[in-house]
Design a protein with these regions (language model features):
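Short beta-strand scaffold positions
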Residues: 39-40, 62, 170
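Conserved phosphate- and dinucleotide-binding cores of soluble alpha/beta proteins
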Residues: 66-189
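HTH-adjacent hinge/linker in prokaryotic transcriptional regulators
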Residues: 1-38, 49, 53-54, 71-76
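Electropositive phosphate-/nucleotide-binding environments in soluble metabolic enzymes
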Residues: 14-21, 25, 42, 91, ...
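Short active-site oxyanion
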Residues: 33-37, 55-59, 141, 164-167
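Glycine- and other small-residue-rich loops at beta-strand/loop junctions that grip anionic moieties
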Residues: 16, 37, 60, 90, ...
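Short glycine-enriched, charge-decorated loop/helix-capping segments at active-site entrances
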Residues: 10-14, 57, 122-126
């Protein structure tokens, strides 16, 4: 299945809330002192921020407008990259965003996705968001894709990475074929 449509943040934030919180809790637990972390825009990555310890000595970079606000409200050191703002996803995208990212070397990255498939890898409907995600994957030492069970076996218009590029953090995974191509951490396991 391939699609080019993407729902807005308000709609997506109401979907699979329990799953996003569970994934967010696991992902937040991966952040440690002295990490230099990228957090992608998106509703699952936003849920992660709620579970990051307030006293963690890490630095965060994000392309999510809401994410930057949530990070600084927790008293965490945060930067937001520059670029064009996309209203639908509240993400910073475009050439300027990619150029901003090229100066960073992240210890950990946490990236959202619309689709995860064995054949199509990690995908999203938007070319500009895919370009940002692809650059982040290149800049990260340890990459994590955050996606609930509804993202599996879905393919969108633009692939931004292959399965082996990142560890998948999900709520539950029934199809073991994905484990042959990527490390998978399950929140409900």
């Amino acid at each position: 299945m391939s699609t080019v449509f993407e729902e807005d943040v308000t709609t997506k934030s109401a979907l699979n809330v329990t799953e996003k919180e569970a994934i967010g809790r696991v992902a937040a637990g991966l952040v440690t002192n002295d990490d230099f972390v990228f957090i992608d825009a998106g509703t699952t990555t936003a849920a992660m921020i709620d579970f990051i310890y307030d006293n963690v000595r890490a630095t965060f970079v994000t392309n999510g407008i809401v994410h930057a606000k949530k990070l600084i409200q927790k008293g965490l050191k945060a930067y937001i990259i520059g670029g064009q703002i996309k209203l639908t996803t509240e993400a910073v995208v475009g050439t300027e965003a990619i150029n901003n990212l090229r100066k960073y070397n992240f210890t950990k990255t946490f990236i959202g996705t619309n689709g995860i498939s064995v054949k199509g890898g990690y995908s999203t409907p938007d070319v500009e968001e895919a370009a940002v995600k692809s650059e982040v994957l290149k800049r990260g030492r340890n990459n994590f894709i955050l996606g609930d069970h509804t993202k599996f076996d879905k393919e969108y218009a633009v692939t931004f990475g292959i399965l082996k590029d990142a560890c998948i953090v999900t709520d539950e995974l029934e199809d073991n074929e994905f484990r042959e191509h990527a490390v998978v951490k399950e929140a409900f396991a």
